[in-house]
Amino acid sequence: MAKAKFERTKPHVNIGTIGHVDHGKTTLTAAITKVLHDKYPDLNEASAFDQIDNAPEEKARGITINISHVEYQTEKRHYAHVDAPGHADYIKNMITGAAQMDGAILVVAATDGPMPQTREHVLLARQVGVPYILVALNKSDMVDDEELLELVEMEVRELLSSQDFDGDNAPVVRVSALKALEGDAEWGKTVADLMDAVDESIPDPVRETEKPFLMPVEDVFTITGRGTVVTGRVERGVINVNEDVEIVGIKDTTTKTTVTGVEMFRKLLDQGQAGDNVGLLVRGVKREDVERGQVVVKPGTTTPHTEFEGSVYILSKDEGGRHTPFFNNYRPQFYFRTTDVTGVVTLPEGTEMVMPGDNTDISVKLIQPVAMDEGLRFAIREGGRTVGAGRVTKIIK
């Protein structure tokens, strides 16, 4: 069968299944692919449970994660769906951002109600900035008591509201992933209803090209007779020839300049956009004024900071991480985008030490300023070896 061309005509949305172990995240993922395959056979292939459950390993910021990606389409949208089978994999994926989510389906078994990992996943989704959650009340075929179902639904709504999600209005859809997967028409319809709710309730994501321009500097060199060129991959936004930019971070001063040329693969372009590897010719800037680790940005949109709070995952010994815990005033390097900057760690009150394999919140004071916004990911390294990963949750200074 010929592979269908990736249509850019539909909005593309990244989603994932989250929730307590054995509540049916992977079964639901398989059921969604089956139901959508039956409904729109030319748009979708069905993925078997085993295909999704035997998740391949992937590396993100030096951390190995087992994670499954499936894709499917509804009438309105193209979806990329991630399912991290293991609890630790889920935590690592959320913190490293291996697979970012525009929204999540929280799977809660009607037979159990919200469990400890349900709470932890919702808390983590809030910390890492998942914008929207809706609920699949799974295994609803196993609960005959309507009042019990209503009670579980109420508990889930309260849990969402407690983490600042819209618990009052979030869709809660009663499904049976297993029955839908077995081909039961009535329960299959509930999964179709769930996807209608996903279509309706998860907002269209803002495309990277629509955000303000930012390019991390990877390299700087001089072209005789033309001036200084900074190279890198455009992280977001668009840059046009003759636009003003600022080069910020690492140094104490901000350099203001104008982009007089954009090159890609030795060809001159009118513009570079998110995802492009480009060289920017910058006017009146000396080579020594710019270094790797800085960022080129639309003026006034990004500022450098030295103090922040972050949510981090520390690698276990088996994952190639530290063999010993670390304490207050730990001084590793924080790798932001293209460079390492040393920082001093302060642990939360009441935490004496952090063990390999833990996830925790920390405060960090960097020795050089780094251009950052809330949500920026980083790796924690010791002498070039990754020992953890994290995400900026709050900028202090």
Swiss-Prot record:
Query: Which Pfam families does the entry link to?
Result: GTP_EFTU, GTP_EFTU_D2, GTP_EFTU_D3
What does the entry list as the binding residues for GTP? 19-26, 83-87, 138-141
UniProt keywords (A-Z) are: Cytoplasm, Elongation factor, GTP-binding, Hydrolase, Magnesium, Metal-binding, Nucleotide-binding, Protein biosynthesis
Which molecular-function annotations from GO does this UniProt entry contain? GTP binding; GTPase activity; translation elongation factor activity
Q: Which reactions fall under this protein's catalytic activity? A: GTP + H2O = GDP + phosphate + H(+)
List localization entries. Answer: Cytoplasm
Chain intervals for the UniProt region annotation (G3): 83-86
- Highest taxon of the lineage: Bacteria
Start and end residues of each tr-type G domain: 10-206
- Write out the residues that bind Mg(2+): T26
Provide a GO CC annotation, any one: cytosol
Q: Where is this region: G1?
A: 19-26
Q: What is its main location?
A: cytoplasm
Q: Where is this region: G2?
A: 62-66
Residues of the region (G5) are 176-178
Q: Where is this region: G4?
A: 138-141
Stored InterPro entries: EF-Tu_GTP-bd, EF-Tu_GTPase, EFTu-like_2, EFTU_2, G_TR_CS, P-loop_NTPase, Small_GTP-bd, T_Tr_GTP-bd_dom
The subunit structure is:
Monomer.
Identification of the protein by name: Elongation factor Tu
| Organism the protein comes from | Mycobacteroides abscessus (strain ATCC 19977 / DSM 44196 / CCUG 20993 / CIP 104536 / JCM 13569 / NCTC 13031 / TMC 1543 / L948) (Mycobacterium abscessus)
User: What gene codes for this chain?
Assistant: tuf
